[in-house]
Amino acid sequence: VEFTTGNYKITTTPRREWQYIVDNVPCPDMGHNRRLIPISELLQQEVSQNANLSEVEVIAIVLYTGPMFQIYNTILRQFPEDKFSIFKDGDNLYSTTIFVLVSAVQKLSRFTRIPLGTMLYRGLGGKMDLPDIFFQIDSKGCSGYAEWAFLSTTSDRNVALGYSGVKERRPKAMVMVIETSSIDRGADISEFSQYPGENEFL
């Protein structure tokens, strides 16, 4: 199934992405400072060793940091429906890959040193409003929303601004600011990222 990413407008397929990452087939789309580090090298990094990551976990992280994030998140959100139905009807919801990616993030989050109070940012694209309920405080003093997919964030405010829709002058451009805590802080996946300049936290 061929698809085009919303961020860097890369047209690719899951098979091609697998070949670039696992089989070391040369990738023609190396713009935006994309890098493809061999999986064998990533497995030797200190963070991989400390978190006891398996080869398939490293592969899943690297795939997510490239164009495949769009497929995995579409499946988890079941949206957009027309895109989701392609994978559902094809009986391939990437269940194993998503399970392995969750495992990798959980392992990394235990060994990733993110100082308390670190601010992370997420650009929201500028195409939609947050619902009113997002801002309403419930009886327990909480507000917000549940994200069904992986929530990519960055420690670099300027990267988030690039994803916010502000450059395109979209009317609803915004950046979400998230303060990390000791309870649920995710993982720094920048060392594995195909786009290291994004300083990605998942």
PLM segments and residue spans:
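Mono-ADP-ribosyltransferase
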Residues: 1-202
